[in-house]
Amino acid sequence: ADAPGDDYVISAPEGMKAKPKGDKPGALQKTVPFPHTKHATVECVQCHHTLEADGGAVKKCTTSGCHDSLEFRDKANAKDIKLVENAFHTQCIDCHKALKKDKKPTGPTACGKCHTTN
């Protein structure tokens, strides 16, 4: 399958819940522009971990049985990989931090540096 171009944007899936701010409803973060070609040196299966098992088909991260929990992250589920938020944050931020530690070029790790578009 053809990879998306550099205009690809990662956004919260429909139905995603925002974390409340005290007794007020919260808001979802801004979307994340994803420059796919900058990640072309990474093996596809590093991010698309079911690629081989699915016969080369790229499925959405929120496919049933994968990262399909749309709850907001809190202390009780902070490590639950079923949460789509945790899946992206673990994959992206951990990789960027590892590259930074190895003094290699990398992407951002701060919220506002990734979540930049509406």
Curated annotation (Swiss-Prot):
<dbReference type="GO" id="GO:0009061">
    <property type="term" value="P:anaerobic respiration"/>
</dbReference>
<dbReference type="Pfam" id="PF02085">
    <property type="entry name" value="Cytochrom_CIII"/>
</dbReference>
<feature type="binding site" description="covalent">
    <location>
        <position position="95"/>
    </location>
    <ligand>
        <name>heme c 3</name>
    </ligand>
</feature>
<feature type="binding site" description="covalent">
    <location>
        <position position="92"/>
    </location>
    <ligand>
        <name>heme c 3</name>
    </ligand>
</feature>
<dbReference type="InterPro" id="IPR036280">
    <property type="entry name" value="Multihaem_cyt_sf"/>
</dbReference>
<feature type="binding site" description="axial binding residue">
    <location>
        <position position="39"/>
    </location>
    <ligand>
        <name>heme c 3</name>
    </ligand>
</feature>
<dbReference type="InterPro" id="IPR020942">
    <property type="entry name" value="Cyt_c_III_dom"/>
</dbReference>
<keyword id="KW-0249">Electron transport</keyword>
<feature type="binding site" description="axial binding residue">
    <location>
        <position position="49"/>
    </location>
    <ligand>
        <name>heme c 2</name>
    </ligand>
</feature>
<feature type="binding site" description="covalent">
    <location>
        <position position="61"/>
    </location>
    <ligand>
        <name>heme c 2</name>
    </ligand>
</feature>
<feature type="binding site" description="covalent">
    <location>
        <position position="44"/>
    </location>
    <ligand>
        <name>heme c 1</name>
    </ligand>
</feature>
<keyword id="KW-0479">Metal-binding</keyword>
<feature type="binding site" description="covalent">
    <location>
        <position position="114"/>
    </location>
    <ligand>
        <name>heme c 4</name>
    </ligand>
</feature>
<feature type="binding site" description="axial binding residue">
    <location>
        <position position="67"/>
    </location>
    <ligand>
        <name>heme c 2</name>
    </ligand>
</feature>
<feature type="binding site" description="covalent">
    <location>
        <position position="111"/>
    </location>
    <ligand>
        <name>heme c 4</name>
    </ligand>
</feature>
<keyword id="KW-0349">Heme</keyword>
<comment type="subunit">
    <text>Monomer.</text>
</comment>
<comment type="function">
    <text>Participates in sulfate respiration coupled with phosphorylation by transferring electrons from the enzyme dehydrogenase to ferredoxin.</text>
</comment>
<protein>
    <recommendedName>
        <fullName>Cytochrome c3, 13 kDa</fullName>
    </recommendedName>
</protein>
<dbReference type="GO" id="GO:0020037">
    <property type="term" value="F:heme binding"/>
</dbReference>
<dbReference type="GO" id="GO:0046872">
    <property type="term" value="F:metal ion binding"/>
</dbReference>
<feature type="binding site" description="axial binding residue">
    <location>
        <position position="48"/>
    </location>
    <ligand>
        <name>heme c 1</name>
    </ligand>
</feature>
<feature type="binding site" description="covalent">
    <location>
        <position position="47"/>
    </location>
    <ligand>
        <name>heme c 1</name>
    </ligand>
</feature>
<keyword id="KW-0408">Iron</keyword>
<feature type="binding site" description="axial binding residue">
    <location>
        <position position="36"/>
    </location>
    <ligand>
        <name>heme c 1</name>
    </ligand>
</feature>
<keyword id="KW-0763">Sulfate respiration</keyword>
<feature type="binding site" description="covalent">
    <location>
        <position position="66"/>
    </location>
    <ligand>
        <name>heme c 2</name>
    </ligand>
</feature>
<feature type="binding site" description="axial binding residue">
    <location>
        <position position="115"/>
    </location>
    <ligand>
        <name>heme c 4</name>
    </ligand>
</feature>
<dbReference type="GO" id="GO:0009055">
    <property type="term" value="F:electron transfer activity"/>
</dbReference>
<keyword id="KW-0813">Transport</keyword>
<feature type="binding site" description="axial binding residue">
    <location>
        <position position="89"/>
    </location>
    <ligand>
        <name>heme c 4</name>
    </ligand>
</feature>
<keyword id="KW-0574">Periplasm</keyword>
<feature type="binding site" description="axial binding residue">
    <location>
        <position position="96"/>
    </location>
    <ligand>
        <name>heme c 3</name>
    </ligand>
</feature>
<dbReference type="GO" id="GO:0042597">
    <property type="term" value="C:periplasmic space"/>
</dbReference>
<feature type="region of interest" description="Disordered">
    <location>
        <begin position="1"/>
        <end position="28"/>
    </location>
</feature>
<dbReference type="InterPro" id="IPR002322">
    <property type="entry name" value="Cyt_c_III"/>
</dbReference>
